[in-house]
Regions:
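A short, N-terminal "cap"/entry segment at the start of jelly-roll beta-barrel domains
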Residues: 1-9, 50, 58, 88-94
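Glycine- and acidic-residue-biased ligand/ion/polar-headgroup-sensing regions
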Residues: 26-45, 53-55, 85
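Soluble periplasmic/extracytoplasmic beta-strand elements of cell-envelope proteins
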Residues: 14, 40, 78-81
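Short acidic-glycine-tyrosine-enriched beta hairpin
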Residues: 5, 15-17, 45-62
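A short glycine-rich, His/Asp/Glu-containing loop-to-beta-strand
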Residues: 1-23
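Histidine-centered catalytic micro-motifs
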Residues: 20-29, 63
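Ligand-binding loop in jelly-roll beta-barrel domains
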Residues: 62-87
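Extracellular/periplasmic catalytic domains that process cell-envelope and extracellular macromolecules
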Residues: 3-5, 25, 33, 70-74
């Protein structure tokens, strides 16, 4: 993104069954496309949601949230982060 203070980071993510990330934020938006398994997402102030293969969702900039894998197999997804340059990709919630 020439001339901007943002960068795009694309990651293939695999989360172990039963893993819970703990409340955290990102310095930009996160677009997620589920590939396999089940994944839960709890954004503060919203009901917890479950996502499965073929579904997509977004985590808004700065939204405090928790997440993890459900079931007995890993949750696999592609995450596209559009975040401020030079800031940590993940920040524990205060």
């Amino acid at each position: 993104m020439p001339g901007s203070n943002f960068e795009v980071i694309t990651a293939m993510v695999e989360i172990a069954p039963g893993f819970k990330a703990g409340k955290h934020t990102h310095p930009g938006t996160v677009q997620v496309q589920m590939l396999d398994g089940e994944f839960w997402l709890a954004i503060d102030g919203q009901p917890e949601k479950t996502y499965r293969a073929g579904e997509a969702f977004e985590v808004p900039t700065g939204a405090t949230h928790n997440e993890g894998a459900l079931g007995d197999k890993p949750a696999k997804f592609v995450a596209v982060y559009i975040v401020e340059k030079g800031k940590p990709l993940v920040q524990p919630a205060q």
